[in-house]
Amino acid sequence: MLRVKSVFCRYRRQARHVSSGEELAAGVYDTVVIGGGVTGTALLFLLSKFTNLKKLAILERRSDFALVASHGKNNSQTIHCGDIETNYSFEKAKFIKRYADLLRNYLCHLPAEKREGISSVTQKMVLGVGEKECSFLEERYPVFRKLFKPMKLYGKSDIHSVEPRVVLKNENTLREETLAALYMPPELTTCDYQKLSNSFVECARSMNGVDSKKISINLNTEVTNIEEANESLYIIHTNRGFIKSRFVVVCACGHSLMIAQKMNYGLEYSCLPVAGSFYFSGNVLNGKVYTIQNPALPFAAVHGDPDIIEKGKTRFGPTALPLPLLERDNMNTLVDFLKVWNPDLSLFHVYFNLFKDMTMLKYVCRNFLFEIPILNKYLFLKDVRKIIPSLTTRDLSYCVGYGGVRPQLINKVSKKLILGEGKIDPGKNIIFNITPSPGATTCLGNGESDMNIICERLNGTVDRPAVRKFLYQGDYPVDYL
């Protein structure tokens, strides 16, 4: 008799209407992906197009794909490359650029009309204000230009030619501060990750029936229980029945950690959810303008971006507010947060080290104030004026219904806050992806890594020449590794 490890995996309060004996899909699947955001759908696309695995499925608890963290309202819509993100070292930028170029090459394979509906081409820059920041950019430029060939170092007059509102204090007067920028000419910079997710699903669905493949797409399907029958068989129970699989990949953002810990994996981690809010202004920028990140803070500095959803508006943000929720504006996820919080002395040691620094403490307190109506605009205006000095409070409006949650992991053993995407791989036929920023940008790179692991453990085959031709060659060739 098989020893069964049963795990209750609720990540939304909802009535269950299906008996545990009803089968959602017949037979044993090669891989089931749990979570239909951009990470999960990218993996489904890769497995369906580039492997010989025959039976694949994706389970998404909501009525459509990418309605949470991957929705365009819940992230900055940026394809992060490491060129204008000053918290990235050269090696980290090289790593991120590779993943960004995989994504951009995928987009370039789409018909022009579809690509333009998903993404947009704009210029971008990181702005330095004052002597210290300008010197920083001047030192950074010769190093990063080796990786980003089109990059240019701009002074005040050059910036004025591409982003006049950045340089003007008012209609007729230039701002007094010294200005410099690392400027990147127009390229694919912006992506609606919800539309991208649906594109991945369409591509995967088109493989249904090709070479006897079966691709099962399941919306409104919430996982309620996972049974680990043995190292190569999992029984996933949902509100619509159960499905069996040889391999499972959980791509449910912060809920991935909750599911993992219910299965006694990743117990060394806690979660620090960081919520981000945004503000709208009129159309004041021609492209993305980032500012230099404070090295003492693990959060992105405020930036301005032409919005891909609200055409004709510029979105400023994000703020960074620690919040005890795994999903913004979903109080049901408070209980879920408490499950992955796991407070102990090690965790409080991490908190103490984070907040004993006055810079961090002031930053967090200030971000709490950014959520207070009326007061928030006056406080946030100071940050925004670093980019557009002529803006007033009348020009800003709080983006109601915008802003997501980034589940930052804390390793309680090493007592460190982990920045960037996380993965829990216990070495069995199950993987858990926890993907805060820049997880959307890295969806195909992360998916390629998972695809290779899956095929290695299932004795499957990856068509590597096809992967290289499709993702590594094209308008954004990955020839710098």
Task: Please name every model-derived segment.
Residues 29-57:
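N-terminal Rossmann-like FAD-binding beta1-loop-alpha1 element of flavoenzymes
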Residues 91-100, 127-137, 182-205, 218, ...:
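Short beta-strand to alpha-helix junction loop
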Residues 27-29, 237-247:
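Core beta-strand elements of the Rossmann-like FAD/NAD(P) dinucleotide-binding domain
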Residues 25, 389-481:
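C-terminal lid/capping helical subdomain adjacent to the catalytic/cofactor pocket in oxidative enzymes
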Residues 120, 130-218, 225-229, 338-356:
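Flavin (FAD/FMN) cofactor-binding and adjacent substrate-gating region
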Residues 76-165, 323-325, 329-335:
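Dinucleotide-binding Rossmann-like beta1-alpha1 core, especially the glycine-rich loop
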Residues 45, 61, 79, 112-121, ...:
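Active-site substrate-recognition segment that forms the wall
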Residues 48-72:
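Glycine-rich FAD pyrophosphate-binding loop
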